[in-house]
């Protein structure tokens, strides 16, 4: 009741934030004349002055006004662009670790320079994160002159970059890259075997461009580095042959069965479920195909893998459609990002689903993978000391940003009022009528000389609209995952008079559509443009620009509503940039996925009650409200899914932090001898306790079992029973001490045979290797636990609590296994010394093996050359077997060096 009154009196939280920042803007403006008076050298010198002041104890907040004034003046001199007051507010929002919502065309890239410059002064590095490599390169190269003018260095991280180049990029003051690359480099760093192999410094400050796309749309996609597991391609092919024989079970909402079948499809949750008849039929088919033993159940423990394959095949055939969820290109199944419409090369679906789709499409089935390291964007970006972001649409997701990332959203006022007209949705009964109306709208706008952008939700739809336009002989450009390489070129000219561009979802996001086209792209296309040519191009562009503005600006047509209002707003936001005129309209039908799956029957009944004729559209607020309600419902469900993913991943994340901290400590340590000694004592104590329980009677002792364990696990052959028979005073504690002393002595002997330095290096390598191997297996176990944990709900248990409890027990076991396996390997390591002849022969063998490998690589290169140049086949050298020239010296024989010691105690080294 009082909320609206209070809001009227004091303004909204956002208005108060903007008002507070306007005071700081005045401070920056007051310094403008002072900065104008400085020479280039003096302006550049400000950077060193700020760094010195920071070193003396001043804070970044205290430097803000001056640093922003310097960045603004540098922008004017280098880029010919002056930051507006609202852009200064955007920069302050980013510096404070918040999300700045700025409308399309308000200069987000330029806004970023303010916060990036200020925070780079600390020397701890700033990461600028973009959604794709093209934008990372474009923004880095665009802003590089500004940063370098101010004395800062800029780097770009890209996939498949040489290590030295990548290390230099991370060492720069400002590093540009994609969210994927930053995340994968973090995982790679935590698989490195030395500190020199690591790339990233401490994660200090990140500015995320299109923050909603990265932190929300991609939050459910984990980052995984994996290695190959066993090959099951034949099984996928066999099961793929059986799946088409299954029929879908279709039931109307009233419970009336319209088609008896074997499985049900739930489109809302994107799941497939076999029914009783389906299970029986699948078992019969698998038995007939020889994949399931006679009389065996699909649900017996050792057949669960087979059941997973069946479900993967079912989902591949029912829920994944070519040109919608994926495309087939060069014999590979490449996924499409549902939010951007871009392809995601290299990204694969897990749980055998990708292989099932490959089998369905008849392409080469790639081997399944085993996870080596993984994290989520949610957990990776929360590692930064300070995080901020920019986007055109964040306000609808403000609650999620606050809940999960602790980030507030500030809506930055536009520099000029928005002049775009957003028309009400038009809803048709069928898709055919809807597309006909879209074509009519395109023709009308083209006749007026207005550019048109048609937004579609899938490649399939974009190609269908393209076919309709071809029939009408309307010239147009298609921008989807198949033609992404032409993206920048198509978007650059999408604002020309009468231009028609079809784009899947938000393909082309991050590049502005300039009314009249982009004259800079035309200039760049010329080899050595003269001043006259540039002037002519600008004049022609000015005419086109004016023509489009007078016609009404860019018209955005959306062929359907997306699940998220935010994606719809992004599409609308392509029109009406920087106060330009423009308009937008959504065309819907009752056959659209969102309407069919989520919109209530009330809307459908309401439209039928109106007695709508074919080709008629309804334009009513009630329908628009119902659609928005459906979208909110879907957004809420997606948020719950992301939150649930985070709650589960938080458990794994805590474990990840412990393991990665342990790994980093090991890499930094020069000597892990003390750690190994602690492990040795703990592992030995646990082994002894297993056979001689603490505070137990000698009658309860399993001496034979202890002797066997000591030999198998520690390589110690100790006569414990003999010790006990000979010494009555040997009780539990003294026996433990004596065994430990024997183990330490045996290990020390190895150290005397080899150098202490060599053994320390070996210990470190073994510890890292054991840790990595066991962590990899632990990730796989956690994955299996997570996929089956929901079943605990049937036993009236809380799945989340059960997951936390069991994963903690698994982690405790992992830590014990790391100690146990490390000591086991180190206890069994053999230390030996070769005689000179044997050493020479070994070195020769190694050299020949290396030569053979080089020959193979060279032979491969020759084969390529032969194909191209018709070169003659080269002869392959054969390896000669090494000949021993002296007799081998036994380990217990006198050392040939004449020291008088046994050979094994004199010249020995680690094998």
Curated annotation (Swiss-Prot):
Alphabetical list of InterPro entries matching this protein: Helicase_ATP-bd (IPR014001), Helicase_C-like (IPR001650), P-loop_NTPase (IPR027417), SEC_C_motif (IPR004027), SecA (IPR000185), SecA_CS (IPR020937), SecA_DEAD (IPR011115), SecA_motor_DEAD (IPR014018)
Cofactors that this protein relies on: Zn(2+)
GO molecular-function term, one example from the UniProt record: metal ion binding
Listed Pfam families: P-loop_SecA, SEC-C, SecA_DEAD, SecA_PP_bind, SecA_SW
Top-tier EC class: translocase
Membrane topology per record: Peripheral membrane protein
Cofactor stoichiometry and binding remark: May bind 1 zinc ion per subunit.
Reactions catalysed according to its record: ATP + H2O + cellular proteinSide 1 = ADP + phosphate + cellular proteinSide 2
UniProt keyword ATP-binding present: yes
CC terms in the record's Gene Ontology section: cell envelope Sec protein transport complex; cytosol; plasma membrane
EC number annotated for this UniProt entry: 7.4.2.8
UniProt keyword list: ATP-binding, Cell inner membrane, Cell membrane, Cytoplasm, Membrane, Metal-binding, Nucleotide-binding, Protein transport, Translocase, Translocation, Transport, Zinc
Sequence ranges of Low complexity compositional bias: 873-883
Domain of life (superkingdom): Bacteria
Binding site for ATP: 87, 105-109, 512
Residues annotated for Zn(2+) binding in this entry: 895, 897, 906-907
Keyword Ubl conjugation tagged: no
Region Disordered, residue ranges: 865-892
Subcellular locations according to the entry: Cell inner membrane; Cytoplasm
One example of a Gene Ontology biological process annotation: protein targeting
Family per record: Belongs to the SecA family.
Summary of the function given for this chain in its UniProt record: Part of the Sec protein translocase complex. Interacts with the SecYEG preprotein conducting channel. Has a central role in coupling the hydrolysis of ATP to the transfer of proteins into and across the cell membrane, serving both as a receptor for the preprotein-SecB complex and as an ATP-driven molecular motor driving the stepwise translocation of polypeptide chains across the membrane.
Subunit and interaction comment: Monomer and homodimer. Part of the essential Sec protein translocation apparatus which comprises SecA, SecYEG and auxiliary proteins SecDF-YajC and YidC.
NCBIfam families, sorted: PRK12904.1, secA
Entry-linked HAMAP family: SecA
Name the UniProt record assigns to this protein: Protein translocase subunit SecA
Organism: Ectopseudomonas mendocina (strain ymp)
